Amino acid sequence: MAIITKVSAQKRQGRYNIFLDQEYAFSVSEKTLAEFVLLKGQELSPQKINEILDYEASAKASDLAARYLSYQPRTIKEVTDYLSQHEISRSAAKRAVNELTHLGYLDDAAYARLFVKNNLQVGKNGPGAVRRDLKKKGIDDDLIEAALADVTDEEWAGVGKRLVKSLLGQQGKIAKREVDRKMQTKLLSHGFSGSLAQAVTQDLVPEADEDQERAALVKQGLKAYKRFKRYEPGVREQKMRQYLYSHGFSGDEISAFLVGEIIPLEELEEY
């Protein structure tokens, strides 16, 4: 049996050094000190020492996890990974996670609901991206689907509009078809389904306005002419056609510009 010959406070508040038989043995938190009533003169068996150290490891894990949770909500996986990075044993981490879950500080279902709610309010991701993000955070599939279940297409459409509204400024600068394509590409890359992306685009960008389309064709046609005017006529026409097609204009619109129906060809240099 070892005897506690000294208990001294560390400079770090709430930590204590335990000396056994005149030699430093280990340090404990105030919580562990109180739990085992560690006082000078107390005898400790090897089993009791192991019990104290085991409890201390769990207490340390709980304290670390609680501090980590104080900044923002976390998932069970995030807390477990954090404790592992701080060299907390798997068993101590598991006990800490179980304790915090029991106390209600760790709740993956509530986390998933809050994550979805925040995305609907200020985020820019569709259901596919939200699902992927939650999965990366270790949320079980059934909890993810439960959190997504009550979100309507109209709510997702609101998120989608927030994501692509900046592209509305390109109307009148490029073809409506190209505005549509850019919007749908961006929506798909942020986890919106094809049907949702199409619905958002149709709602934001109504049928093409003839004057806007003409203005866009003139703007891009002049850009193409200035870029390629140094080429021979045949090559220049081919390159202009490719350029305008890549900006969403139809073959008929491009041909109309190239034959001078939009702007007389002899006047192009004046712009």
UniProtKB/Swiss-Prot annotation:
<dbReference type="GO" id="GO:0006282">
    <property type="term" value="P:regulation of DNA repair"/>
</dbReference>
<dbReference type="InterPro" id="IPR053925">
    <property type="entry name" value="RecX_HTH_3rd"/>
</dbReference>
<dbReference type="Pfam" id="PF02631">
    <property type="entry name" value="RecX_HTH2"/>
</dbReference>
<comment type="similarity">
    <text>Belongs to the RecX family.</text>
</comment>
<dbReference type="GO" id="GO:0005737">
    <property type="term" value="C:cytoplasm"/>
</dbReference>
<dbReference type="InterPro" id="IPR036388">
    <property type="entry name" value="WH-like_DNA-bd_sf"/>
</dbReference>
<keyword id="KW-0963">Cytoplasm</keyword>
<protein>
    <recommendedName>
        <fullName>Regulatory protein RecX</fullName>
    </recommendedName>
</protein>
<dbReference type="InterPro" id="IPR003783">
    <property type="entry name" value="Regulatory_RecX"/>
</dbReference>
<comment type="function">
    <text>Modulates RecA activity.</text>
</comment>
<dbReference type="InterPro" id="IPR053926">
    <property type="entry name" value="RecX_HTH_1st"/>
</dbReference>
<dbReference type="Pfam" id="PF21982">
    <property type="entry name" value="RecX_HTH1"/>
</dbReference>
<dbReference type="Pfam" id="PF21981">
    <property type="entry name" value="RecX_HTH3"/>
</dbReference>
<dbReference type="InterPro" id="IPR053924">
    <property type="entry name" value="RecX_HTH_2nd"/>
</dbReference>
